[in-house]
């Protein structure tokens, strides 16, 4: 009986040790071909208002995303996040905002954004040659910081890899 308990304990410990790395891998979302620095091409994009003078996204190989935007009126905004598979994560630099990124394929990611309890779904595509990334914002309304009234919101941003 002691031998069976020892074998069972050894088997359980072995399974836990083998499963632990799988849990870590399942949470990571490496960027693959999405990694790099991307700059918006305003001429090919559609913004809800005046186009920003700079819209740059940097995606690290580990999947971390950093966004740098300079609005048409010169205001700078920086925000970032590191997506985790199956998990909504907080966005640094955007209060009360989270995002869950769902990998649909190597060429498409869906995003579920939550801002102050309101949910918005968007998606991004990557061209087969890996040189163009397109972000498709969900139609709806958006209240810009400092504004009291929401405005219609629709956005398609074409980013080119640098």
Each model region followed by its residue ranges:
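Sec/Tat signal peptide C-region and signal peptidase I cleavage site
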Residues: 20-26
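Bacterial N-terminal signal peptides that target proteins for export
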Residues: 1-13
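Hydrophobic small-molecule pocket/channel-lining residues, especially in calycin-type beta-barrels
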Residues: 27-162
